[in-house]
Amino acid sequence: MSETLKRLSAVIESRKPANGGDPDKSYVARLFSKGDDAILKKIGEEATELVMAAKDARAGADKSKVLYECADLWFHSAVLLAQFDLTPQDVVNELARREGISGIEEKAARKAD
């Protein structure tokens, strides 16, 4: 996992209320204090903004907005992971587990579980 993601994960973890995160001083601590629904709402908003940026880029707009919105989505996804005591490394591990497996086969295996 990249050093940037490791640092980001550590900062997000430090913003949890149990670790002294102050909702009056930290956006992430505020999200944690508001709970799952606030975090999920932000992810929905960021996902929609990413979709719109991609559509705009396909129509000729600045594709850097795709990058910005994707970064926002990744960031808020990292907050959600931390909310469930998971990390970006857990996602990397899952991707590594799936490596070399057909997407169709992998999805079928999940349905069988």
UniProtKB/Swiss-Prot annotation:
Alphabetized GO MF terms: ATP binding; phosphoribosyl-ATP diphosphatase activity
Organism annotation: Janthinobacterium sp. (strain Marseille)
Entries under CDD domains matching the protein: NTP-PPase_HisIE_like (cd11534)
Protein known as: Phosphoribosyl-ATP pyrophosphatase
Keywords: Amino-acid biosynthesis, ATP-binding, Cytoplasm, Histidine biosynthesis, Hydrolase, Nucleotide-binding
Catalytic activity: 1-(5-phospho-beta-D-ribosyl)-ATP + H2O = 1-(5-phospho-beta-D-ribosyl)-5'-AMP + diphosphate + H(+)
Entry similarity comment: Belongs to the PRA-PH family.
Enzyme Commission number(s): 3.6.1.31
Subcellular locations according to the entry: Cytoplasm
Enzyme class of the recorded protein, top EC level: hydrolase
A Pfam family matched in the record: PRA-PH
Chief location category: cytoplasm
Superkingdom assignment: Bacteria
Gene for this chain: hisE
Matching InterPro entries: HisE, PRib-ATP_PPHydrolase-like
Single biological process term from Gene Ontology: L-histidine biosynthetic process
Keyword Transport tagged: no
Biochemical pathway: Amino-acid biosynthesis; L-histidine biosynthesis; L-histidine from 5-phospho-alpha-D-ribose 1-diphosphate: step 2/9
A GO cellular-component term linked to this record: cytoplasm
Keyword Transferase annotated: no
